[in-house]
Swiss-Prot record:
Swiss-Prot/TrEMBL keywords: ATP-binding, Cytoplasm, Fatty acid biosynthesis, Fatty acid metabolism, Lipid biosynthesis, Lipid metabolism, Metal-binding, Nucleotide-binding, Transferase, Zinc, Zinc-finger
SUPFAM superfamilies: ClpP/crotonase
Name of the protein in its database record: Acetyl-coenzyme A carboxylase carboxyl transferase subunit beta
Gene that this polypeptide is encoded by: accD
Organism (species): Granulibacter bethesdensis (strain ATCC BAA-1260 / CGDNIH1)
C4-type Zn finger ranges: 29-51
Reactions mediated catalytically: N(6)-carboxybiotinyl-L-lysyl-[protein] + acetyl-CoA = N(6)-biotinyl-L-lysyl-[protein] + malonyl-CoA
Protein family membership: Belongs to the AccD/PCCB family.
GO CC annotation terms, alphabetical: acetate CoA-transferase complex
């Protein structure tokens, strides 16, 4: 053998050999199984470039995709940490710490105010990446704060839902957030402001049973799972075979549960048009304070006979 085969060729193979490739360069679509370059997926708002499957986005991505540049995130009120001192296979405080380290969020909701194609809006986005987007006291505080901000700014309130339901580690405290958030949405409506809900995959449990179905306009992303209990639980309880596509956005559209199914690429423009239709030429009632909307109306007194 010559020195070319014994020395030079191995050196060339080493130099041209496979380099270490980061694990996050490619993403496999869960629908069509095609591999997508991560950068292309990010540019396409996490929608598959092959089959148009809408993958789940983070709460911060929702704000970025929806609001114009220059929006402002608001600091949300702090909620009590682990008031029940709950522990299952792991302490609740440890679960919160791990979720915060992983997501860099305080809890399963973020709120910001800004504009959508020039239309003023307050936007809240639930974070499924934070303990499955479960609703506890902190999420309730966030929704109430967002509703109050919308009233004070006389801006529409838009919320992107993504949740597995109430947070079991907070027991009855999490269930209390259902009527609490319902009252918050009513406050927005009494101020004459639009409340728009965008249902994303998945929206289930106590979130579906409360504020998520109370929008003046109900929008869903394609093929989003939307429901209360899971399909298997319903089939086991009713002993009936559910129709194909049950609890998916398109099925709900056909049956009048949602008003429209909108692709992510069209969401900004759609929200802007909806806001314009609901607010142009509308005279809003004068609001001196948020509290004035929540005070119970006292019946008029009649004079004694």
């Amino acid at each position: 053998m010559s020195w070319l085969t014994e020395y030079v060729r191995p050196k060339i193979r080493t130099l041209l050999g496979r380099r270490d490739v980061p694990d996050n360069l490619w993403v496999q679509c869960p629908a069509c199984q095609q591999m997508i370059f991560a950068r292309d997926l990010e540019k396409n708002q996490r929608v598959c470039t092959h089959c148009d499957h809408h993958m789940r986005g983070t709460a911060l991505e929702r704000l970025k995709w929806t609001l114009d540049e220059g929006y402002t995130r608001i600091e949300l009120p702090k909620a009590p940490q682990d008031p029940l001192r709950f522990r299952d296979s792991k302490r609740y405080t440890d679960r919160l710490r791990d979720a915060r380290e992983k997501t860099h969020l305080d809890d399963a909701i973020v709120v910001a105010h800004g504009t959508i194609e020039g239309q003023k809006a307050v936007v809240a986005a639930m974070a499924f990446e934070f303990m499955g987007g479960s609703m506890g006291a902190a999420v309730g505080e966030g929704i109430v704060a967002a509703a109050q901000l919308a009233v004070l700014q006389k801006a529409p309130f838009i919320i992107f839902t993504a949740s597995g339901g109430a947070r079991m580690q907070e027991a009855a405290i999490s269930l209390m957030q259902m009527p609490r958030t319902t009252i918050a949405t009513r406050m927005v409506k009494e101020a004459g402001l639009p409340f728009i809900v965008v249902l994303t995959d998945p929206t289930t449990g106590g979130v579906t049973a409360s504020f998520a179905m109370l929008g003046d306009i109900q929008i869903a992303e394609p093929k989003a799972l939307i429901g209360f209990a899971g399909a298997r639980v319903i089939e086991d309880t009713t002993r009936e075979k559910l129709p194909e596509g049950f609890q998916r956005a398109e099925f709900l559209l056909e049956h009048g549960i949602v008003d429209m199914v909108v692709r992510r690429a069209d969401m900004r423009a759609t929200l802007s048009r909806v806001i314009a239709l609901l607010t142009e030429g509308v005279t809003l009632p004068k609001v001196e304070s948020v509290a004035s909307l929540t005070e119970a109306k006292q019946p008029a007194r009649t004079a004694d006979a």
